[in-house]
Amino acid sequence: MFVVVYWWRVKPGKEAQFREAWRRGTREIARIYGGLGSRLHREADGRFVAMAEWPDRETWQRAYDAKMIYDDKEARAMFVDAIAEVPPDNAPAFMMEVTDDLLGLNVANPPQSD
């Protein structure tokens, strides 16, 4: 699995709009390009940070090269309208191969070790 981390600063008062647009866009990207989904977080400094999961780097690269364009033009316009700042060149903050995955770990009933 391959994970890509993105961040954005959102214009004050546009947070709900951004989140709706992000959800809609993420669903479209998964449907069209084969992404596995994403989680959106809010940093203490106010930035929104997304961790997007992909089956592999090649699948992500094809989507990235295609600029992840999707048909929901309204969602895309909402997203762009809400953005105040992006990283230089709109580049991902991190691109990582997953080595160990305990994200779905049930801490109430942990698996038994061998």
Where are these regions (language model features)?
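An amphipathic, aromatic/His-enriched active-site/gating alpha helix that lines ligand/cofactor pockets
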Residues: 24-36, 53-95, 111-113
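Generic structural motif
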Residues: 11-13, 57, 101
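Polar low-complexity intrinsically disordered regions enriched in Ser/Thr and small residues
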Residues: 16, 28, 37-38, 107
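Short, surface-exposed ligand-recognition loops at beta-strand->loop->(often short) alpha-helix junctions
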Residues: 9-20
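Short amphipathic
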Residues: 7, 94-100
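C-terminal/domain-terminus segments
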Residues: 101-114
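Short, well-ordered beta-strand segments in beta-rich or mixed alpha/beta enzyme
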Residues: 2-9, 37-67, 108
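Short, low-complexity N-terminal intrinsically disordered segments enriched in polar/charged residues
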Residues: 16-17, 42, 111-114
